[in-house]
A protein has these predicted regions:
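Glycine-rich phosphate/pyrophosphate-binding loop shared by adenosine-nucleotide-utilizing enzymes
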Residues: 8, 62-67, 84
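Conserved acetyl-CoA-binding loop-helix of GNAT-fold acetyltransferases
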Residues: 91, 97-110, 137
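Conserved beta-strand in the GNAT
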Residues: 57, 63-72, 90
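Conserved GNAT acetyl-CoA-binding A-motif
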Residues: 105, 112-124
Length: 153
C-alpha cells in the first residue's frame, strides 16, 4: 500500500459511515441514488444488530473509499462449519490499484476464519474480467464453482 495513506483506517463500518458508503456504492450501482433512504437506514439498522454480518471498509479522512460485506452463514454440512459470503466489493475509482480492495477483503476473510468458516465465496459479474483477475491474485479460485443468479422483483 502507498505511504500516502497514513490517515487511512481499516475497520468495521458503522452507522456514522452510512452516507459515505452510499456515495461509494453509487459508483458500483447508479440506482443507489434512487433507493428509499428510509429503507436503506432500516436495512442498516438490521445489519448492525446481526453479528453475522459485517461491512469492512477503508476510510480516508472520514470518507469510505473501499468496502465489502461479509455474511457468516450457519451450515449443517462440512462438519457443521459455517461459510462466508462476500458481496458488494467496491473501491472508489480514485483509489483503485493501491491495495485497498485486498485489505478490505482480507478483513472479511479474517472474520470468516475467526468464525470457523470452512470457505469464503464471492461472485462477480461475468464481464468484470479485471475484477476476476484481482480475486484470483488474492487467492480465490474462479475455476472450481459456477455461480447462478436469480433476480427477484
Amino acid at each position: 500500500m502507498e505511504d500516502g495513506y497514513k490517515s487511512m483506517e481499516f475497520r468495521k463500518l458503522t452507522g456514522a459511515d452510512l452516507e459515505s458508503l452510499i456515495d461509494l456504492y453509487a459508483q458500483l450501482d447508479a440506482d443507489m441514488r434512487k433507493a428509499d433512504p428510509d429503507k436503506i437506514k432500516a436495512a442498516w439498522n438490521e445489519i448492525e444488530r446481526d453479528d453475522k454480518i459485517v461491512y469492512c471498509g477503508a476510510v480516508d479522512n472520514g470518507k469510505v473509499v473501499a468496502a465489502c460485506c461479509a455474511v457468516i452463514v450457519p451450515n449443517i454440512t462440512s462438519f457443521a462449519r459455517p461459510l462466508c459470503l462476500i458481496e458488494n466489493v467496491v473501491t472508489d475509482e480514485q483509489y483503485r490499484n493501491r491495495g485497498l480492495g485486498k485489505e478490505v477483503i482480507g478483513m472479511a476473510v479474517r472474520k470468516a476464519k475467526e468464525s470457523g468458516c470452512y470457505k469464503v465465496m464471492l461472485q462477480s459479474g461475468i464481464k468484470r474480467t479485471g475484477a476476476h483477475a484481482f480475486y484470483e491474485k488474492i487467492g480465490f479460485d474462479g475455476a472450481t464453482k459456477k455461480a447462478f443468479d436469480m433476480r427477484l422483483k
